[in-house]
Amino acid sequence: LLSDFKCYCRHDNFLEIKNGYDYEEVHDVRFQSQFTMAFVGRFYREANPTNWFKAFSELINEEKLPSDCQIKIIGNLSKLEVPEDIAPNVSHIEPVAHTEAIRMSLDVDTLVVIYSTGRKGVYTGKLFDYLATNKPILALCDPEDVVGRLLDETKAGFTVDNADIEGIKKMILRCYSIWKNKEVLPRDWEKIRRYTRKNQCKILLEYLANETGIYAV
């Protein structure tokens, strides 16, 4: 979006404000009795779990993941094509209030975000919600795009191209190993806290104060 502004506008004086999160960060991590991955929100035609399901299925069939590993889909309304062999592993949960979705995200071991291949410069609100959960984030996206850079910066998770089945399998196994060994990723909390909504609003107010002199921070 910023790139488009720079192309079509006569100046480049732009400020990008992220969505951010507005709840308390979590430091007391709970591990589930079975390795559990989750996606919170809705899928769309180009951003769907097909390759995630395929990689998960192959890992179970190859006996690299235990057969009782779980996937939770929370809040999706569209019909999903779940491979028959992992249908018992996949649970579908009706849409819930945002605060309840945050609570439910704490009762899993890996949180997944999925972006369509080739989609650039887009964050989702759930990504910022995930940052403060202290759960590993697995992003299926362009690792060189903004989501990959955010996860590298905050050390909150991993990225892999959504079209790379073998790469997705490797990252699922990495997340599984973290769960199995009861590890907690060494997040950079100082950088994560930059993405609270309070701090994002502060950036906006400082910008307005500097540019217009109207607002005092």
Predicted feature descriptions by range:
Residues 163-167, 180-211:
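A charged, aromatic-enriched C-terminal amphipathic alpha-helix characteristic of glycosyltransferases
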Residues 97-109, 132:
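Short acidic alpha-helix that forms the nucleotide-activated donor recognition element
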Residues 17-20, 31:
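Carbohydrate-associated surface elements
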Residues 105-122:
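Acidic donor-binding loop of glycosyltransferase active sites
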Residues 29-47, 53-56, 200:
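Conserved donor-binding/catalytic core segment of Leloir-type glycosyltransferases
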Residues 1-14, 23:
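A short, active-site helix/loop in glycosyltransferases that binds the activated sugar's phosphate group
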Residues 63-102:
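Nucleotide-activated donor-binding/catalytic signature segment of Leloir-type glycosyltransferases, i.e.
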